Amino acid sequence: MASMITVDFENCFIFLLLCLFSRLSYDLFFRKTKDSRAGCALPPSPPSLPIIGHLHLILFVPIHQSFKNISSKYGPLLHLRFFNFPIVLVSSASTAYEIFKAQDVNVSSRPPPPIEESLILGSSSFINTPYGDYSKFMKKFMVQKLLGPQALQRSRNIRADELERFYKTLLDKAMKKQTVEIRNEAMKLTNNTICKMIMGRSCSEENGEAETVRGLVTESIFLTKKHFLGAMFHKPLKKLGISLFAKELMNVSNRFDELLEKILVEHEEKLQEHHQTSDMLDMLLEAYGDENAEYKITRDQIKSLFVDLFSAGTEASANTIQWTMAEIIKNPKICERLREEIDSVVGKTRLVQETDLPNLPYLQAIVKEGLRLHPPGPVVRTFKETCEIKGFYIPEKTRLFVNVYAIMRDPDFWEDPEEFKPERFLASSRLGEEDEKREDMLKYIPFGSGRRACPGSHLAYTVVGSVIGMMVQHFDWIIKGEKINMKEGGTMTLTMAHPLKCTPVPRNLNT
């Protein structure tokens, strides 16, 4: 689960202009000149403008495309500056591999939180916490209780129930000839799945709880745009940038806190009555109350973990489902081949299940190819200490931006990189296990790499695979117009600029 940071620079342009005068004043009157490190060179840097640095290069094109274009022109390892905000941009598989291998601990922390006490992007967030005792404890806990193979096996029935509910929703819309916005419906599915896996029940649609959670998740993701912008500055301008959205951030955080506190109290009362744990939240509360626990977690850390899981776990999978279905609908031959595989292995009278996935290699290849072309987002980290990469000097506290989008479209590693070709992963699966693992570490990193890679990648593959399999197995998909608009959205989280809307048509009604 990687951390999902989004930013739309076009909408922020006016704000940036307002900051120019402040930035210039700071440089002229307050900033002290620092001696450069003798004998050391920063990575190459494209031509920049006074004050704003390289910001003009990424204002009007989606950020992943902008960075890909910059790297294609100037090189795979670059030093960029947005105002006073230094970034090392990596767009090469080999360079990224070297960093995660040689500097894994050094780049295992993410940028510091803008507001410590916020449940969103705050210091209690698992995604944003520095690498240390808390991050190691929580990752171990999540693997054991939620995301590891044994934990996923225990929660398999939850996902099967939600998949069946999703199928019935699509079937109902199909019978009524209603159009489906794929991402919205997938968000409901992933939200319910995550809720049930964490706390044993889904958020209620009847009392508006589910809609509240989805709304808060959407607002939280939107606020990360402003966080990224505010983080571009160093003191005192950083405080100014953050203060402009602090009230809004805390408002969303407080509403999340109110909702999650009710859920925690509900579970505490259940634990007092039954004296046994039944889900991940119960186990977290048990650890919270245990004075002899391996790590003494706080109540805010439990709540922030929920926010992290809701935000990263629901949006990333929903976006991947939407992108992959768009590619399948665009390519009828691929769709037909996938159906033939599913029909031969699963049949036509039951839904695809998770246990079928190992026997559906083409479906697995389609999911991998969807993630290759449309990865959830970049890897954003911070260099904790000064180091050397490819002979270049990297100062401490420099931000690392690994453009996963560019790496997984690198023509040096991928044949026809802009084409949707699932067969490439069938070929790679014939490699020896060690060769395949090394090749993937080099060029295929949709969920990041190293010790802070997304721990939920296996769950994502499982959910996306079973959902895509069911949607192709049981429905034809009719779109309005001649073709699907595949334009990418202008955010760091890779979204479709025009949401995929289509009408499901049942293939058979014997399920």
From Swiss-Prot:
Heme binds at C454. SUPFAM superfamilies: Cytochrome P450. Gene3D superfamilies: Cytochrome P450. CDD domains: CYP93. Expressed primarily in the root epidermis. Its cofactor is heme. It is a single-pass membrane protein. Its EC number is 1.14.-.-. InterPro entries: Cyt_P450, Cyt_P450_CS, Cyt_P450_E_grp-I, Cyt_P450_sf, Plant_metabolite_P450s. One of its GO terms (molecular function) is heme binding. It is found in: Membrane. It holds the Pfam family p450. One of its GO terms (cellular component) is membrane. Disruption phenotype: Increased levels of thalian-diol in roots. Keywords: Heme, Iron, Membrane, Metal-binding, Monooxygenase, Oxidoreductase, Transmembrane, Transmembrane helix. Constitutes with three contiguous genes an operon-like gene cluster that is involved in the thalianol pathway. PANTHER family: CYTOCHROME P450 705A5-RELATED (PTHR24298:SF475), FLAVONOID 3'-MONOOXYGENASE-RELATED (PTHR24298). Converts thalian-diol to a desaturated thalian-diol. Belongs to the cytochrome P450 family. This is Cytochrome P450 705A5.
